[in-house]
Amino acid sequence: MLNYIDLLNKYDQQHLFKYIEMAPTEEKKEKFISEIEKVDFEKLRNLYKLSHQNFENVMKAVILEHIKVFDKSRFSDDERNDILSIGKKIIENNEYAVVTMAGGQGTRLGHKGPKGSFVLNVKPEPKSLFQIIAENLIRENNEYGVILNWYIMTSTENNDETVKFFADNNYFGYNKDYIKFFKQGNLPLLSEDGKLVVNHDFDIKYAASGNGTIYKAMLNDGIIDDMKKNGIKYIFIGAVDNALLNMVDPMLVGLNKKRGTEIASKTIIKNSPNEKVGVFCKKNGKPGVIEYSEMPESLIDEVDENGDLLYGESHIMCNLYTIDAIEKIANVDLPYHSAHK
């Protein structure tokens, strides 16, 4: 195993030597060196290289195609009733769970604290995003005669505040035995030139590693095992900042069950071709999502024979998975998508 001097020289992180020298105490110096030796520099280097590939060259190797979607308004009454019946049975059997991704801070909303604690000025009284979700789930529980398991993904940055926020608000009336928190992973921050970022306290600065790491976090924190123990077969994953999100949709889970698929998503059509939202498509023949910033300009306005956008189905973070799909994804290493902040 390489010591910290060899590590910093090998991975071109020599700027950290000055922080070691500037450490205010010997204890802080030793702690900082210990942090350095825990960093997976090889993984970081590979991620940095991946994020700085020539994007145009990468996209040239990707063949994009329109992906088929189901419009629920076009189902016959018999089809709709059949799908609803299947979906309702799954929910009534308590084989359905909800996961809320809430690892972010409310910074962009001008709010200090977890994003889920941000208060909206709704009628008849203001409510936090967490309260809105909790009350929506309570209504669904009452309708189906169950108590759905609710899993909430936090982050290292906001976990303690989030757990306290729920406790201070008596879990918004939700049965706390059915709420479980788990933390998403994190990664050291890199500057644009690939250097590790250090904060004012002489600690390597970390940030949440993205929503895509939710599956691995569910595995590592025992959430998948807990779901299996509770007989859960379908999991809906949504974001905390979508106050209008319908998390318990018998049509979605019923259609997924009827067609025997492992993953299903809800989508809405873009307001305009240039709306800044990722869209569903096929990438090299496989279902996927392409970010608005990555969509080739030649395809943005492309329409079909009916005049509808070929790439107009927005990805709005409304995704349903079977427990088998979650477990499969959790056991593979997904590629990272770089975020420049």
Regions found by a protein language model. Give the residues of each.
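Generic beta-strand/beta-sheet core signal
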Residues: 101, 112, 153, 182, ...
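Catalytic core of tubulin tyrosine ligase-like
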Residues: 231-236, 244-248, 253-341
